């Protein structure tokens, strides 16, 4: 599991680096254009109405920069969407295929969707397991034999004999913490913690929506359900 988280942390770090490079390139190009126009204005002051032209070009430049930065900022949820694709393609679908090969009937696979990333800590997951057991379920951790792209254990949940459900905590989401820290710390203020919680919730929601979309695309919606902290279905 740690190996998988290291892989996902690498993806998030790579995204942050690319985003920073893109912003720097835009800033450098815009500065170069401005300097070039100013030099031409100084060198040939009387040949063209430089003041009007530079004014228009600076407005166009500003609009273009804002548009490009807007496109970059729209990528804010890309790390969560990338994690969703990795989770479904490298773990969820192979895991379901393996379980279906073993099961004599249909299976139910539940994915836990947290309200915030702290719910995926070891301590909170342990408390969640106790809550599930308190509701009359028997729990058993099982290991998948086939390669699913990353080491991963599943929680087998049973209430009545022969009634089985598989439960997973998508801890791959924890790798988003470094991205959240980067985004919030770059504008650090007294509301940083609140911003981190709010951003974490938005990223979890983006992950959930993309996983749901991929599940429907792969015709797995009859097998997979989502549950929240209160064990209610989404």
Curated annotation (Swiss-Prot):
Pfam families: prok_STING (PF20300). The cyclic nucleotide binds in the C-terminal bacterial STING region. In the C-terminal section; belongs to the bacterial STING family. It comes from Roseivirga ehrenbergii (strain DSM 102268 / JCM 13514 / KCTC 12282 / NCIMB 14502 / KMM 6017). This is CD-NTase-associated protein 13. GO terms for biological process: defense response to virus. It is a single-pass membrane protein. The lineage of its organism: Bacteria, Pseudomonadati, Bacteroidota, Cytophagia, Cytophagales. The chain crosses the membrane at residues 20-42. It comes from the Bacteria. Keywords: Antiviral defense, Cell inner membrane, Cell membrane, Membrane, Nucleotide-binding, Transmembrane, Transmembrane helix. One of its GO terms (cellular component) is plasma membrane. Effector protein of a CBASS antivirus system. CBASS (cyclic oligonucleotide-based antiphage signaling system) provides immunity against bacteriophage. The CD-NTase protein synthesizes cyclic nucleotides in response to infection; these serve as specific second messenger signals. The signals activate a diverse range of effectors, leading to bacterial cell death and thus abortive phage infection. A type I-D CBASS(GG) system. Binds c-di-GMP (synthesized by the cognate CdnE encoded upstream in the same operon) and about 10-fold less well 3'3'-cGAMP, but not c-di-AMP, 2'3'-cGAMP or cUMP-AMP (tested with a protein without the transmembrane region). The effector protein for this CBASS system, its activity is stimulated by c-di-GMP and leads to cell death. Its main location: membrane.
